Amino acid sequence: MGSTDEPGSSMHGVTGREQSYAFSVDGSEPTNTKKKYNLPVDAEDKATVFKLFSFAKPHMRTFHLSWISFSTCFVSTFAAAPLIPIIRENLNLTKHDIGNAGVASVSGSIFSRLVMGAVCDLLGPRYGCAFLVMLSAPTVFSMSFVSDAAGFITVRFMIGFCLATFVSCQYWMSTMFNSQIIGLVNGTAAGWGNMGGGITQLLMPIVYEIIRRCGSTAFTAWRIAFFVPGWLHIIMGILVLTLGQDLPGGNRAAMEKAGEVAKDKFGKILWYAVTNYRTWIFVLLYGYSMGVELSTDNVIAEYFFDRFHLKLHTAGIIAACFGMANFFARPAGGWASDIAAKRFGMRGRLWTLWIIQTSGGLFCVWLGRANTLVTAVVSMVLFSLGAQAACGATFAIVPFVSRRALGIISGLTGAGGNFGSGLTQLVFFSTSRFTTEEGLTWMGVMIVACTLPVTLIHFPQWGSMFFPPSNDSVDATEHYYVGEYSKEEQQIGMHLKSKLFADGAKTEGGSSVHKGNATNNA
């Protein structure tokens, strides 16, 4: 026998007893066998309380991974906006080029959000979020190498695909938290994610200035600055993939193999999403809440820079206030919806949405008409509160439209936000027909007009803004959600998760229904 030190003589890897190291994408909790959670849960294992500063797995860990990854995507998508005064000089961009780039930045995710909805329904939100964040990283790095308007517009379009992480964010929260607190949770996750639009207004000018002071020229400094959001993408993608999990009980693939989760068909999911008229109303509503927020992120820094002759850093700070308001505005919208639902049920949620979004539109008109810096800043802050709170109030209702097709409906609604933004940017901010202040004024008018269809949303079990329920609230709630499954599908138990959701959603009838049920049970 040869020496044990001889190359090839080691038995390492043969006995299977040696310590080994590997990278896994299966997540931290592949499945769950009747485990206890750190938070109180309902029959679906969804958390019934929201502890903001907790990192308990899986619920709160998922919350933090979700909003941080979404915020990272917002930072990169709008990283160019606060640097436009420098970039336009370097690339010789015209107002038309800048407007088209703004449209491109939010148009890319119209398609990707639709795809993300299906990915969440069929594969789970963890894979969808992690892979999209990491696949977007090369496009962020590519911004450093653009040399003309065409390249600038193309790269902004490609980076915009990553905004589809919004869909995985909202879907993920809806699978982890109880319906009675979903408005607050969805609003906080999305609001803190959207806050990236404000963070980037502060971050990118500071990074640019640091690089310039280190010896780089202005036209080189802005290019190097894009490496910061690019690396953030890679880091967050790895964290989501390794630390996240799809459902409270584990990852979707593992639970499907164990028979704990039914594998659905894409055709059925798509059918129930597109044939529900409420879906399309929310697409429109979100187009003029989130959509106008995205449009404003693209123009607000340049607006203050040009109109009031401010320094780039000062304009960036003011513009950051618009995005940073998401820290509390969007959660407040979801929280207000939850509070209204406790007393007035779904009808309270609908009234809350209409009041908040209409108010935001009126403040937007005021912003466009403002003649002084102080007035413009005040009206911008109030407009941001209204628009962002309306986003929170919208996604406090979306999870109730359909249980089976939640992912695709979330994707369609999210895509509506991007489509509305692209259309608004194209009509009001991409040509010389309107000045920026005129564009803001007409955008406010459109917000008010496009919020009116909320009056048409009617749930048979809960009613609408002006009409009461058309069926008994308790029995109709189960029928509404379980009715999305055929008798054959119900026989094999595909409807059971929806039935559990319906049991929890019966509280959307309002306090009068609770009292009625208590009386009957007595």
Swiss-Prot record:
Gene3D superfamilies the record matches: MFS general substrate transporter like domains
Protein known as: High-affinity nitrate transporter 2.2
Family of this protein: Belongs to the major facilitator superfamily. Nitrate/nitrite porter (TC 2.A.1.8) family.
GO molecular function: nitrate transmembrane transporter activity
Subcellular location: Membrane
This protein's record includes keyword Transmembrane: yes
Membrane topology label: Multi-pass membrane protein
Induction trigger: Transient up-regulation at transcript level by nitrate. No induction by growth on low nitrate concentration.
Keywords per UniProt: Membrane, Nitrate assimilation, Transmembrane, Transmembrane helix
Annotated tissue distribution: Expressed in roots and shoots.
Transmembrane region(s): 67-87, 103-123, 127-147, 149-169, 191-211, 224-244, 269-288, 308-328, 350-370, 381-401, 408-428, 439-459
InterPro entries in the record: MFS (IPR011701), MFS_trans_sf (IPR036259), NO3_transporter (IPR044772)
Domain of life: Eukaryota
The species this protein was found in: Arabidopsis thaliana (Mouse-ear cress)
Cellular component per GO, a single term: membrane
UniProt GO BP: lateral root development; nitrate assimilation; nitrate transmembrane transport
Phenotype upon loss of function: No visible phenotype.
Gene designation per UniProt: NRT2.2
Known role: Involved in high-affinity nitrate transport.
